[in-house]
Amino acid sequence: MVPTILLSALLLHFTDVVAAEPRYILWVSSVVQRFSSEKACLHLLNLNESVSLSVTLEYDGSSTTIFDQPVDEGNFYACADFKVSQMSSEQLAFVALLVQGNTLKISERRSVAIAAEENATFVQTDTPVHKPGDTVHFRVVTLNIWLKPVDDLYPLITVQDPQSNVIFQWINVTTFRNITQLSFQLTPEPILGDYTIVIKTQSGTTVMDHFTVNRDVLPKFEVELTAPETITIADSQFQMVTCAKYTYGQPVQGKAQIKVCRELFSPAHCESNENEICEQFTVQLKDGCASHIINTKVFQLDRSGLFMTLNVNEVVTESGTGVQMSKTHSVFITSVLGTVSFENMDPFYRRGITYFGTLKFSGPNNTPLVDKLLQLELDGKPVGNYTTDENGEARFSINTSEIFGAQISLKAVYVRPRSCHRSSWLSPEYLDAYFSASRFYSQTSSFTKIILEPKQLPCDQEKMFSVLYSLNPEAYKEASDVTFFYLVMVRGGISRSGQKQVRVQAWNGNFSFPISINADLAPSADLFVYTLHPSGEIVADNVRLQIEKCFKNKVSINFSRDKDLPGSNTSVHLQAAPDSFCALRAVDKSALLLNHGQEMTPESVYFTLPYIHQYGYFYNGLNLDDQQAEPCIPQKDLFYNGLYYTPTGNIWDGDLSNLLSNMGLKIFTNLHYRKPEVCSSQENQPLLRTFDHPNERIMMYGGGAPPSSAFHDSVDSISHAKVAIKETVRTNFPRTWIWNLVSVDSSGTANVSFLVPDTITQWEASAFCVNGNAGFGISPKVSLQISQPFFVEVTSPFSVVRSEQSDMVVTVFNYLTTCVEISVQLEASENYEASINTQRNTDSEVLQAGEQKTYVWTIIPKTLGKVNVTVVATSKQSRACPNDASKEQDVHWKDTVVKTMLVEAEGIEKEATQSFLICPKGTKASKQTLLELPSNVVEGSVRSFVTIVGDILGVAMQNLESLLQMPYGCGEQNIAQLASDVYILDYLKATDQLTEELKSKAQRLLSNGYQNHLSFKNYDGSYDVFCQSNQEGSTWLSALSFKTVEKMKEYIFIEETVPKQTLIWLVKKQKSNGCFRRDEKHVDTAQEGREGDQEDIALTAYVVGVFLEVGLNASFPALRNGLYCLEEAFSNGVTNGYTQAILAYVFALAGKEQQAKSLLSILDKSATKTNNMIYWERDEKPETDNSPSFIPSALSGETEKTCYVLLAVLSQDTQDLDYASKIVQWLAQRMNSHGGFSAMQDTTVCLLALTQYMKLTGSNPQNTITLSSEESEEVFYVNRNKRLLVQHSKVSKGHQQYTVDVEGDGCSFIQATLRYNVPLPKEASGFSLSVKTGKSNSSDEFQTKFELTVTLTYTGARESSVTVLVDVKMLSGFTPVVSSTEELKFNSQVTKTDIKNGHVLFYLENVPKEATSLTFSIEQTNHVANIQPAPVTVYSYEKGEYAFDSYNINSISDSQ
């Protein structure tokens, strides 16, 4: 066998001392940053003559000079700064080195990359969680890689809802002093979930940030559960600590109920069929906290067959109010009692330099195991025993002088005592540690090693770095001075350089040198230390320094006081670099408890920053590794001392080229720095270098309150008058308090005053600042605790029914430093009776410091409507209390809380209206009004008023958000409202009546409505009645949506793709004959023409009418083919009155006058003409409608049909306005009190018709209107300037007769409205309905939760009712359990659930003739006695079908 010898050792033996020939080294970063200062360092050694030196950076036809100077003979070292100052699209560049003398010429040219200008854009929202209807504020700031602000232009900023619909858009947004600040308003009914803010930057990158929209109520207090993350099977017990604190820092008084369970794998094997082992206990909170020791014996931790987790569920209940907050926690169980690991290990060992490392022994939760014996093995042989210190660590060192192997293998084990365990149970384990270190190559066997403590280095201090060295003395002179050099690289570029001269006595030693640590190096830097061996080798080492994430712009904010009072004045002191521009933000801590979101922190800023760590010489597709490899060593035997040796390389050895590649540092040199490579055969291909990594570079992206002491700790800083009583009224409760941009003056400070909100909470405040020179900085968070030493809280139900008795819970908090005498009074009122249920000896009592007391009053309301209940709590010094209050603290306080309670009448509400459009034409015109009440009206529930306005559309203009008296939970109601608003806006704009105030209001409504309506859009562009059903969309609804969204583009932002996508879907619904296919569902059978064979014709007419209304070109294929379908139907004969009306309108729009006139002539013959009015009735007139006023009337079809005729008359080339006015007279009588009509369909069509009519006729009234009865007389004036003014007159007896006299010219609209309650009707039409209540847990002694089951059956003429609403009113003092209502969405018929103003709404589709049951839970939150029944209503949207029932909890059954 031929012996082998390590190649490096053989080469060293055969290497003679190299002659002193000229040497050179040029250091330059492989990626050069544009517009930033870069550095290059150059060594010239052993020059035997003077030379000229030139180093240039060549790029895109230009060049930048780095060095250009003469150099004398000898040695030369210098570093030069340079900058790429020109814009260039080219990324590839070259650095050229030229050293020219008489006899010497050194020339080398290598590639580098010029980094594309990359910036980081950050988004900050005012709060991470918003509620419906909020105004959302956000900021945008862009920084370059050096944290300098960039005055960027953002081509596009959009906001996307959870379904990726763009709901807001800003184009070409500029910054103000490098910060952009925008806002938008959410609709009151938004899609709940995560919203996305999308920023398109000038460079083409996209930045996104998120916030959440939900209906969560801000938590009253927070619960912290402290328990170990992990326990071992050997632990007999562990401690669990529960703490509950109000957001303003004070402890909660109450109790904690804790349940700890361990689940079984197979519960079926248990006799009791239980699937878990549980322990439950209750602990009382003391000072807001409670500690409990959990005994683990019951959980059998070392038993197999159970999950290795303890599930902890905790509920904290506040005393007095019963408010609960829950918390969950998981405790993991492990059989691993300890883990040995290696820490701070170098991947390479250097022979001759001691190898250092750390052993760590830790238990679960990373707890250090102290005073334990660990054994270290090297290549399988023990080298020493080590005992762990108080940190569970033990330092070790290994002498490497006699180690020659390519790798060393280390193993560390815990020297454990012997033990025995049963095989069927879990056994304790200890995990060993393993590590391998490779040899580092040096041709001269010379090494350096930087010693670095493995911790983050703090900013703004000087750090001493120690370097070990072991140098081969060959080629050195005796007692030589050796010069060590260092480079510091930050974000891919050379930032600093220096040198240290060391007097070498022994060739193994160490030295130290300082480096100033500051923000320029953050968040990490590479330190590279090297020396030049006379034998022609570079001896070097590098380490990566982790730097504190600090900023050059030092920003700090402070409140004038750490704690303050609600409603007080405070100031914020801001410090930053002079002339900085700063963004302040203060958020209620309660909002952060819901979701911390992507908070802007130093960590998130640096994490997002595109700083460079180059691994390998690849950048953006460029291979910058153009260093020519040295010739490989042929695999040829060498003869030495009588033996043949075969060269063997080692692919695992580290060398300097690895270190340089890791840093992205390029070298131009003729010195030795690579390990030799053996020429390989095909079967012995060398592997890639261990540390070369072909990634372009690493780019990091991301998003990203101390418990306070008792209030009295700082109450001394709040000055109180010693005699005056402090009285507070609290009304301002925002989630975000401070959202301001502030300039810092030339001294670097700013003071800003703010009014503290009334929320008793803790505010979390911070600021970030930008400055052209100092760059970006962000402050640490500061807190301001807001509390009153003495205040009262009141809890009561939102609404009650008259004659019910409700409990009002009043809690008084005393956070003064002493006990006080308190008095709590509920003020008397003629609107209610009040009696106290809490026993007390006198009107005043003593309340100890830090405690609270609860009182309960029973309230019996006497009047209907909103009733204000006033509670007053006062405090004063008591003789029974020691006088230990702070001298500066006043104990005289008065806190007043006014609680509003809605008192409702029994039964359900009905409405009757009587309307007239009176046009006197210079004479006097009179009308009589008489609205009669039914005999069963609820006493005291009658409300009546008369409305006078000079424009028939005036009432609708005042009710743009509520034209109909019904819930807006379906897509049909939502788009009908939007369409009506657009018609009115178009009318106001056309008649020059659109004021900025009205336009602003309408735009807000349209924007909110558009957001809502996107929730009904399917992914194919169609719209459905219910949110995102993604079933077959409704053609009628999609057509109306397309038209409305197209017309809304004139007033608000609409994403272009939204209507286009709907148009594409509509076109696909067209058949080959040009007609549009009827909908399989959501068909409104209440209207004529939407039944039978002519349904396709009516639907086609509607869609074609939409195409014409939005102005599609007549050549548009779907429009042209649709008209062909309608003409064919017309020629075949149309007998249905509704279809005739809509066809007449469409033909008039299309300019087909002959067909329009023919249809109008036919319709005129079937019209009802009476009292100067014209209208059309249904062919089959239904019985008189007795349904409640909020249920769509079956007679709405007559109104819609009449309005289509009016549209047809007005759309002809020659309009008959006299004929049209008679139709309008009848329509005026059909208007409801909100300006709409009976239902959604007739409202949209009729408002379009009325706006078209008013555009043609105008509105210029000059009227005097007298409203008189036997008892009173009132006069109103209407003129051109007041034509849109809606005037009201409350009348004492709305059901008596009134006379309306109108004098003057022009028209005025007069409407009398009567509202009243009647007992729940017993009749039904189309449905049967029953409601049952049951106990949710029959074992509860004090029942607070109940199950409510609503069962409905369709009994109408059709197979099923298409769109149905179930409205369940909550009993007084009760609220629905939201999770139980949400679960009903899994019912195939329930498409949506909603909770509004004490009502639970269920939207259903296709309710069959079989019984459908809905079961959900309700919970009593406030005690109410003599509870009145609550009504439940079911009705159909398309047809006047309905049923009623009621429920109560007086008679209940246990739920099974």
From Swiss-Prot:
It comes from the Eukaryota. Inhibits protease gelatinolytic complex activity against type 1 collagen. InterPro entries: A-macroglobulin_rcpt-bd, A-macroglobulin_rcpt-bd_sf, A2M/Complement_sys, A2M_N_BRD, A2M_TED, Alpha-macroglob_thiol-ester_cl, Alpha-macroglobulin_TED, Ig-like_fold. The gene is A2ml1. The keyword tRNA processing does not apply. This is Alpha-2-macroglobulin-like protein 1. PROSITE patterns: ALPHA_2_MACROGLOBULIN. GO terms for cellular component: extracellular space; protein-containing complex. Glycans are attached at N48, N172, N868. Pfam families: A2M (PF00207), A2M_BRD (PF07703), A2M_recep (PF07677), MG2 (PF01835), MG3 (PF17791), MG4 (PF17789), TED_complement (PF07678). The keyword Chloroplast does not apply. Homotetramer; consists of two dimer pairs that are disulfide-linked. Part of a complex composed of complement component C3, CLCA1/CLCA3, A2ML1/OH and ALB/serum albumin. Keywords: Bait region, Disulfide bond, Glycoprotein, Protease inhibitor, Secreted, Serine protease inhibitor, Signal. One of its GO terms (molecular function) is serine-type endopeptidase inhibitor activity. Residues 1-19 form the signal peptide. It comes from Mus musculus.
